[in-house]
């Protein structure tokens, strides 16, 4: 019941996705052969949200992996959990998109998209009552942004009434890996505004800052960054997978967070984040979690919520705690920081409580906020876009793939 189909595309998406499955397998007690080796029946009760039970009691993730070059997927396959995925669900091309949105969306990606859709259809037919799709991708490259948005729009056509949730890694302001990021990101955002229901906005720079300042890691790797992302991804869906006092699902989330259909870009945060050395000095209490969760340093994208106002927010707590205390803390936050909330939506914080905490923690919380300050991200990308587009720099790479200048 209520299955979620996970799709990962491009190098970034596949690396985040691989990490995410490590976390989910750990939570449900599934080892790297797909066999269950956990210790509580709660782990199995709703395991079918993310897993399909195959013959011989193996659990197979409902995941579709796609890329336009085989490299990253080979490393996923040879990674710790590479053997649990269904081999037919690896769909890859040979040519690569070369950081070019047009290649991913129009030429190379369009050739591969039908085989991806076949796999998606197969997985969807295996579901009892499909709730929606979650897509991991980045917006700076070619495959994740171009082919990712193409896939999202195709799925939208075929399953118009299912939720579409994306975890999108935006180009960061200071750290840039490609010159044409602003083009790719702008073209993608245009698609996401139309075709996605909920976008969790992530950003490498903000994640680096969290690793650096909060977790006190001297040299954070992409693995550490992806671990943060996967903690959040797991938190968003914990209510579907474990019993709780106040449940939420993707649709409830959307209904409570989106005041106007185009404003569906959210900032996410996760608590408790503590460096390995200072863990034993912190008390895990609801007020403590709440405080860290609303902290601007805790946001996983480079926009400062203090520069805007929250339209709505959602807090998901995990672990054994009193719902009364959660409600008190939420009211408390809204009263103390009332200037940061819009006054035309009263009680705009939704909270939910799930009884089972993540592995290794007593309690944890995930934060999702719909804040007006997210415009900083869009403004930054669009300024970089305008600067290049004014000179028509790099455009020939896109027009050469059959795009028209008017599309920009």
Curated annotation (Swiss-Prot):
Annotated GO biological process: microtubule cytoskeleton organization; mitotic cell cycle
Signal peptide positions on this chain: none
Function noted in UniProt: Tubulin is the major constituent of microtubules, a cylinder consisting of laterally associated linear protofilaments composed of alpha- and beta-tubulin heterodimers. Microtubules grow by the addition of GTP-tubulin dimers to the microtubule end, where a stabilizing cap forms. Below the cap, tubulin dimers are in GDP-bound state, owing to GTPase activity of alpha-tubulin.
UniProt cross-references to PROSITE patterns, sorted A to Z: TUBULIN, TUBULIN_B_AUTOREG
InterPro entries with a match to the protein in the record: Beta-tubulin_BS, Beta_tubulin, Tub_FtsZ_C, Tubulin, Tubulin/FtsZ-like_C, Tubulin/FtsZ_2-layer-sand-dom, Tubulin/FtsZ_GTPase_sf, Tubulin_C
Major location (coarse): cytoplasm
Gene Ontology terms, MF aspect: GTP binding; GTPase activity; metal ion binding; structural constituent of cytoskeleton
Similarity remark: Belongs to the tubulin family.
Any one annotated GO CC term: cytoplasm
Binding site for Mg(2+): 69
Swiss-Prot/TrEMBL induction comment: Decreased in the hypocotyl zone of cell elongation by water deficit.
Organism, scientific name: Glycine max (Soybean)
Protein name: Tubulin beta chain
Annotated compartments: Cytoplasm, Cytoskeleton
Pfam families: Tubulin, Tubulin_C
Cofactors demanded by this protein: Mg(2+)
Chain residues that bind GTP: 11, 69, 138, 142-144, 204, 226
Complexes and interactors: Dimer of alpha and beta chains. A typical microtubule is a hollow water-filled tube with an outer diameter of 25 nm and an inner diameter of 15 nM. Alpha-beta heterodimers associate head-to-tail to form protofilaments running lengthwise along the microtubule wall with the beta-tubulin subunit facing the microtubule plus end conferring a structural polarity. Microtubules usually have 13 protofilaments but different protofilament numbers can be found in some organisms and specialized cells.
Record has Nucleotide-binding as a keyword: yes
Entries under SMART domains matching the protein: Tubulin, Tubulin_C
Keywords: Cytoplasm, Cytoskeleton, GTP-binding, Magnesium, Metal-binding, Microtubule, Nucleotide-binding
């Amino acid at each position: 019941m209520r299955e979620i189909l996970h799709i990962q595309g491009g190098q970034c998406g596949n690396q985040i996705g691989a990490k995410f499955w490590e976390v989910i397998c750990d939570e449900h007690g599934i080892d790297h052969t797909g066999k269950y080796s956990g210790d509580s029946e709660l782990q199995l009760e709703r395991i079918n949200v993310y897993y399909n039970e195959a013959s011989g009691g193996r659990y197979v993730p409902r995941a579709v992996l796609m890329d336009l070059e085989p490299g990253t997927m080979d490393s996923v396959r040879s990674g710790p959990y590479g053997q649990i995925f269904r081999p037919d669900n690896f769909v890859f091309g040979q040519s690569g998109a070369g950081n070019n949105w047009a290649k991913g969306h129009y030429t190379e990606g369009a050739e591969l998209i039908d085989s991806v859709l076949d796999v998606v259809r197969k997985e969807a037919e295996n579901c009892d009552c499909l709730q929606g799709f979650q897509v991991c991708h980045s917006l700076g490259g070619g495959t994740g942004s171009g082919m990712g948005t193409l896939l999202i729009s195709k799925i939208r056509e075929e399953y118009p009434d299912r939720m579409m949730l994306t975890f999108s890694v935006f180009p960061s302001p200071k750290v840039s890996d490609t010159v044409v990021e602003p083009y790719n990101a702008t073209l993608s955002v245009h698609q996401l505004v139309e075709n996605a229901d909920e976008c969790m906005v992530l950003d490498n720079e903000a994640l680096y800052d969290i690793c650096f300042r909060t977790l006190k890691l001297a040299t954070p790797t992409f693995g550490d960054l992806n671990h943060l992302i996967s903690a959040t991804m797991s938190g968003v869906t914990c209510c579907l997978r474990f019993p709780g006092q106040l449940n939420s699902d993707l649709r409830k989330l959307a209904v409570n967070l989106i005041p106007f259909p185009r404003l569906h870009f959210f900032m996410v945060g996760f608590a408790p984040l503590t460096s390995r050395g200072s863990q034993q000095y912190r008390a895990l209490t609801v007020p403590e979690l709440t405080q860290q969760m609303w902290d601007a340093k805790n946001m996983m994208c480079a926009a400062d919520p203090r520069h805007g106002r929250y339209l709505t927010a959602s807090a998901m707590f995990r672990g054994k705690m009193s719902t009364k205390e959660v409600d008190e803390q939420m009211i408390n936050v809204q009263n103390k920081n009332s200037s940061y909330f819009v006054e035309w939506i009263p009680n705009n914080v939704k909270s939910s409580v799930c009884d089972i905490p993540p592995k290794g923690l007593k309690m944890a919380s995930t934060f999702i906020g719909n804040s007006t300050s997210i415009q900083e991200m869009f403004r930054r990308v669009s300024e970089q876009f305008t600067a290049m587009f004014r000179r028509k720099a790099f455009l020939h790479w896109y027009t050469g793939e059959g795009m028209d200048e008017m599309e920009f």
